Amino acid sequence: GRFVHTEMRRLGVDDRHVVTKAAYNTPVTFCEIFPPDDFPLYFYREPSAPDLELTWEDLPLEAIRDASIFWISVTGLSKEPSRSAHHAALGARDRRRFTIADLDYRPMFWKDEETAHREVSKILPKVTVAIGNREECEVAVGERDPERAADALLEAGVELAIVKQGREGTLAKTRTERVEMPVTSVTTKNGLGAGDAFGGAICHGLLSGWSLEKTIFAASTAGAIVSSRLECSTAMPTEPEL
């Protein structure tokens, strides 16, 4: 964990609540690059990844409760004790505004799709924003069509549903508003990290009080900028670039 802490500080990220698990290695991920749309990932997380070994005792529950924004990935629901830790965090959060679930479904981390659907379904009433692509929405709510998927997420309890559609752009819906945003056209070098940039821009837009349209435009553009670059975390755009 030493490298992770050092890199976070170098990038200006507050790491005071980042827990290390001495018994486990920092996971390593390799990405092959076959532009424009094939970027297979190879994860080295055996025997287990430290993020999946988090317990509720590791969590700064007051900080989670009081945070202006709180983001989880559903990968954390794939295994105990991380699953229970996530439920503890969401319980402390108590559906405070900007409680976000990234529907980031990675089959290799789950027993099967049915298990993933069951566990993701349990947390949707506890979050206010859900973000995923069509495949991830299908796992979460059984709907692949963007309109029906967004509606199903809203029916499950979220206040803002965002469905990423790749080259077809992004659909975002609340109970009173609908935004369709075309993809920002770039020459793709590496798609790895585009989703992270998209999510980061969503967080920035929500915290800045931007309109839904401006927020989704910024997110789409941020993802496109990163996909036009070779790197990932160090390729994230700044607000002036957007």
Which role does the model predict for each range below?
Residues H5-R10, F34-D37, A116-V120, E147-A150, ...:
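Short, hinge-like loop/turn segments at secondary-structure boundaries
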Residues G1-V74, T99:
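Conserved N-terminal subdomain of the carbohydrate kinase-like
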Residues E62-R65, P125, A156:
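Structured loop/turn residues at beta-strand edges in well-structured enzyme cores
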Residues I69-A152, E168-T170:
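Conserved beta-alpha-beta core of the PfkB/ribokinase-like small-molecule kinase fold
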Residues F3, A88, K122, K126, ...:
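A non-catalytic, amphipathic alpha-helix used as a structural packing/dimerization or gating element
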Residues D15, R97-T99, A161, R178:
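Hydrophobic anchor at the start of a short beta-strand
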Residues G91-A92, G142-L242:
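Conserved phosphate-binding/catalytic region of the ribokinase-like
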